[in-house]
């Protein structure tokens, strides 16, 4: 029996430009888009550039745009795409500079990350840290990020308005939220959020949340709380004064009675 063949249009080119080339790929049960790209590489296009690593949806390497939607190639099933289109079009993330074919230069993200003050405990505090379980659960969602940068690619501030000089992007709102909400962190990143990081640039369309493969509620649980924190400390004079006069955070008390046990949380 002849296998059904799938039509793939794959973007080929680099920083100087390029275009789509069409390939006919035999479809097999359970095939994902990354499988199809690998078949193309093994059957006549060995020079097709494609970044990947785990093929399990955990490394974030194989990010691309599939029929215009940012997604991981290893988690996008061919049969599901074909339910809505007879052609599968694969192209690199458009918000980042092209290197070769489906490979983009995402180094800007690492430069931004270095500008964020890392986890900063109170003077004298040392790991292991004791924390209430409810405090751990507040930030565990943000720690699921695999740095696929799909949220950066879909963000209209970065994509449509080239706002890299004014906005860190959703991925780093998640990182800043994980630090700001950490019960043992004492650094004040609100001035950076208000100015350099540009949290006000986001108008909460939730497009970043929609494409996140780890289902992090980026808008609701990271960006909106950070916006509220900036508004409280930057525009409410009473809250601003009280924040600067507040005592340092006391250490979390040990669990007693029937309370849930405390848990450790790695910090980075």
Give the positions of each predicted feature.
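Iron-sulfur-associated redox domains of electron-transfer enzymes in respiratory
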Residues: 2-109, 142, 152, 156, ...
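Ferredoxin-type iron-sulfur electron-transfer modules in oxidoreductases and energy-metabolism complexes
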Residues: 31-43, 90-268
């Amino acid at each position: 029996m002849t296998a059904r063949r799938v039509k793939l249009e794959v973007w080929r080119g680099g920083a100087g430009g390029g275009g789509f080339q069409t390939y006919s790929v035999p479809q097999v049960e359970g095939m994902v888009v990354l499988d199809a790209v690998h078949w193309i590489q093994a059957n006549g296009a060995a020079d097709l550039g494609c970044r990947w690593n785990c093929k399990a949806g955990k490394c974030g390497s194989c990010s691309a745009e599939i029929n215009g939607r940012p997604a991981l190639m290893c988690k996008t099933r061919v049969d599901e795409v074909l339910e809505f289109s007879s052609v599968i079009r694969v192209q690199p993330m458009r918000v980042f500079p092209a290197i070769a074919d489906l490979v983009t230069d995402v180094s800007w993200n690492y430069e931004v990350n270095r500008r964020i003050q890392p986890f900063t405990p109170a003077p004298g505090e040392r790991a292991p840290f004791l924390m209430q379980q409810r405090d751990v659960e507040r930030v565990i969602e943000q720690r699921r990020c695999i740095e696929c940068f799909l949220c950066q690619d879909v963000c209209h501030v970065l994509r449509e308005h080239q706002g890299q000089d004014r906005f860190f992007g959703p991925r780093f709102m998640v990182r800043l939220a994980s630090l700001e909400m950490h019960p043992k962190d004492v650094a004040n990143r609100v001035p950076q959020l208000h100015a350099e990081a540009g949290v006000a640039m986001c108008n909460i369309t939730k497009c970043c949340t929609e494409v996140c493969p780890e289902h992090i509620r980026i808008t609701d649980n990271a960006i909106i709380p950070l916006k509220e924190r900036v508004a409280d400390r930057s525009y409410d004079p009473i809250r601003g004064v009280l924040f600067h006069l507040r005592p340092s955070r006391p250490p979390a008390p040990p669990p007693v009675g029937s309370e849930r046990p405390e848990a450790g949380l790695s910090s980075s």
